[in-house]
Amino acid sequence: MGRGNKTIDKLMVKTIFEDNILIPLPKVFVENRLFPLFSIISPTHCDSCSAKLNVNSHYTRFILTSYGTIARNTKYWICPNCNKSFHDQIVGVTGSANYSDEFYDKQNFVRYDGRCSLNNSCRIGERYTEGLTDICGRAPCASSLWLHEQKQASVSKQELLDLDSDFDGTLYIDGDWVKIGWKNKLETSICREITSKEWKKMRYRSVYTIATKEKVILDFEITDRLPTIEALIPLLTRIKNRFPEGKIKKIVSDEDKAIIGAVKLVFPEVVHSFCVFHQLKNVSKRYYDEFESVKNIPENDKLVYKEICKLIKSDTIIYSVVCFQNILELESNLELSKASHKAISYAKEIFEKNIAFLKKGFTPETDNTMEQIFSLIGDVVDKARSFKTESGLTNFCYNLFAHFNKRCFCTGKWVGFSPIMRARFQYG
């Protein structure tokens, strides 16, 4: 959704009739037919013996929805031949649940878009249903939301794995740390207390994600904190089997040894680039810490700054060596600030590292696709704080990534488009 002032959408205006607000209910597909939300679908014949059903009893169900609490008169049916019981189906309500599916969906949007924990998602739901479902409002509790999240994960998993998104031939892979585990339960199982130092090492996991330039997330793998090459091979193999041979032309990652080794084994013929965006960011940070803005950097220091950036972006060993020699000359001939001396020390560290990658055939890449994705994902994960089990984290990731693939950009030239829509618009 776009930001700032927008004109009022008059198509969404509600009418007031006899002191009541009239809200037209949306229609949803049930078995390839459209039905108004919360309408009743009654069974007619037994699914076992095909006999016509008889009414057994009447029952009024109260459904908690984002529109308020809705009462629906339903019937229970019985087969006269085999005594099998049936009941009416309320469109938009799964089984005998007290909450409607759309209410659960809105709570999930609150959780992911609002970067909320399960408990905070419940509190927000209570706020926007004040006077509708209860005096203080009522929303699915943390346990109900968690259970709904686990069920929804199977749908999200299929969406993610069946996603047929076109791209420009370049894929981006990176990992980020998340916290997981239940300390008290683990201590009980091993019959001893775990120190804080041990717990910090034990509770971290890494979520490795593969995405396109359009920020469409294709797949992920949860590994140990510092994974081996073998831990990432299943993820890359799934991606290799998903696309025709020759479709993937380049893979971009950071200097992670596990990624480099796994890519070399699974994609030996594909060009592998290493992302230098974070190197550029680290250099810039040293200057921003001292001068706060590029405009405030003295001319001598600007020369050093530009030369270090050229060094980082160098795509040949010769050009990289030339840039490094220029930096050393500037260091010896010019009066420089502390920021420049810190930046030059950092440049000396990364020079040898980048040369080693260039010798192996790697090329530098300045695209910050994965940094943008993980800055968003990391914000959600930090505030979710609900990962007691690995299966819970896996299901959360399936839901989160499927949600972000369909979530529209709020800023930039692609505002109003989701990553999937952007990919379809660009590549058809």
Model segments located where?
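Short, flexible, mixed-charge glycine/proline-rich loop motifs
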Residues: 32-43, 67-73
